[in-house]
Amino acid sequence: MADPTPTPALPIRPGALQSIVEFILELDKLKGVSRKTRPLGLERYENSAEHSWQIALLAASLVHHAPKSADGESAIDLDRVIHMLLVHDIGEIDTGDTMVYVVGGWEERKAAEREAAERIFGLLPEPQGGHFLALWLEFEEGASPEARFANAVDRALMARPLAEIPLGWYPREIRFDDGQVLKGPN
């Protein structure tokens, strides 16, 4: 399935490369956003950049199990899914990680994350910045089969820390059997 909105080709304009460099330098801050889970076998918490990389590879590994089209091919555009997963947590640069099990305050957190995504993608020249923001919004809204698949992949890793209790979410007292695992806005 062809991507209906491919990444736009950009002419090299004065300042465009500088804008892209500023964007990439801003993205480096994602490495400093600590999440609430720890990598297997490590005492430290993972960061959002590591998370995005891991779920992009998980999506590539799982795409063969996604729904098929009439011709037997995957109905999911993997490139689009990977692009969504690489940008889905960009707003956390400004807002920090929000644990999906937090009850209440979702509207405020989502608004702050959107404002952050608009700021960060706004560092890029158009139409590229708008393209990345559109992918981010598509993921947030679950507005396509690709976005729903990407959201499922993102949430699939949430069960992993339960396999390593007490290192996982134990300090936050979250257990599989208390109904917390499925909480969140989506």
Language model features with spans:
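Alpha-helical, largely C-terminal catalytic domains
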Residues: M1-N186
